[in-house]
Amino acid sequence: MEATLPVLDAKTAALKRRSIRRYRKDPVPEGLLREILEAALRAPSAWNLQPWRIVVVRDPATKRALREAAFGQAHVEEAPVVLVLYADLEDALAHLDEVIHPGVQGERREAQKQAIQRAFAAMGQEARKAWASGQSYILLGYLLLLLEAYGLGSVPMLGFDPERVRAILGLPSHAAIPALVALGYPAEEGYPSHRLPLERVVLWR
């Protein structure tokens, strides 16, 4: 499949992006979604654990159920696609051979596995979920920028009942759910963004 070129460069996408809650009815091609997701999955993570997982929801009935779990937010049902970003650290830890670099072999590989396992053994379940969520927000940032660059509008959502989302999608009880992302071709411009100036938030030492 021929790659789709992004519409915008990274800086332009970052400056232009707004949250979009109204979408055209046009479906988002699966090939385009795959291309965006593959690029987003290049996001970095500590130890390269990549604890994030994504459910791509296009089924109308499932979106309707997710809307109810998201306290009635209409764009959850009306968007052509909803991404459910969840974090499953337990799955990542159970498959360390998938994430440790293939160039690391022998004793170094075993030592790295043991170091990772020791680091998380002392953590309780909630701390592990919080850690995995924090890593997943890095992916979320990549994803939002890429969607904008490829001409798609999106809005990240943290307002939902995670237990209901887990039940709807059959996710494991230990999984954290950092965000939902509604997306599609924009049917509105969205509100102009308002951000603090660099001088307010950046310290130079």
From Swiss-Prot:
It catalyses: a ubiquinone + NADH + 5 H(+)(in) = a ubiquinol + NAD(+) + 4 H(+)(out). Pfam families: Nitroreductase (PF00881). The keyword Flavoprotein applies. CDD domains: nitroreductase (cd03370). Optimum pH is 5.0. Its cofactor is FMN. Homodimer. Belongs to the nitroreductase family. This is NADH dehydrogenase.
